[in-house]
């Protein structure tokens, strides 16, 4: 998992980075959004990771 940058916006932690395709959808990579608290503590798992569009960190 390559995470380039983390930021909290409007109570939502936006992780700018990519993950293997098997983690989310059939695409090669996906950007992630996780709960702000989970982001702060670094506790991110597949169950709380959501794809938000095309990954720009290829």
From Swiss-Prot:
GO cellular component: cytoplasm
Recorded coiled-coil stretches: none
PROSITE patterns associated with the record: PYRIDINE_REDOX_1
Residue numbers binding FAD: 5, 12-13, 21
EC number assigned by the record: 1.8.1.7
Cofactor: binding details: Binds 1 FAD per subunit.
Reported cofactor(s): FAD
One GO molecular-function entry: glutathione-disulfide reductase (NADPH) activity
Catalyses which reaction(s): 2 glutathione + NADP(+) = glutathione disulfide + NADPH + H(+)
Similarity comment text for this entry: Belongs to the class-I pyridine nucleotide-disulfide oxidoreductase family.
Quaternary structure (record): Homodimer.
The name this protein goes by in its record: Glutathione reductase
The species this protein was found in: Spirulina sp
